[in-house]
Amino acid sequence: INRNNKVEFLGSAVDNKYTGIGVHRLYDCLHVLLQNAHKHARSDCPILVNVVTEANAISSQLDSLQITVTSSTTDDKYFDQKQRIHQAICASEAGIDMVTEGYSGIKKIKFITRASEGLSTLSCNPNDDALELALTFSLHVEVASEFSEKGADQRKYY
C-alpha cells in the first residue's frame, strides 16, 4: 500500500486477536479498502478504521467482526466516487469473472464476504455533508486463544 494518509484505528475490538482462515479474509478485505482510501482520500484527513464485534450466538469461539473504513474526499471527486462505489456494490458478477480476470477492489470484498458469510456484507454509508465515504464489511473470525505455560501447546496466535 502506498500510504499517504495517517490511519487511525479505533473501536472496541481493535486489540482483539484472531486466527485461522478468517485472518486472511480479513486482511484481504481491509487491504482493498485501505488501498482505495489512500488512493482517493484527501491527503490532509486521516483514514479511520473502526473495528467492533457484534453479539454472536453461533459460537463463543467466533467473533462477528465489523470493520468500517472511513475517508474524506474533495467535493469535485466525492459524488463520482460515491456513484462508482454504489454501482460496484450493486453490480452482479458471474463466477466466471473470478477465473478469467480475478477479482480486485470491491468485487474482491463482495466475493470473499459472500463465500464466507453466505452473502456479501459490504455496504457504503456516505455522508454528503462531510464528504465522507464509510465502507463496512462483516466477517466471522476465529478468536485466538493463548495457552498457559503448563499447557502442551505453547503457541500464541496474533
Feature locations, PLM:
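Glycine-rich/acidic phosphate-handling loop/turn and adjacent ATP-lid/helix
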Residues: 56-108, 146-148
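C-terminal end segment of the histidine kinase catalytic
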Residues: 127-158
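Conserved catalytic segment of the transmitter module in two-component histidine kinases
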Residues: 15-23
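Short hydrophobic beta-strand elements within the C-terminal catalytic ATPase subdomain
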Residues: 120-128
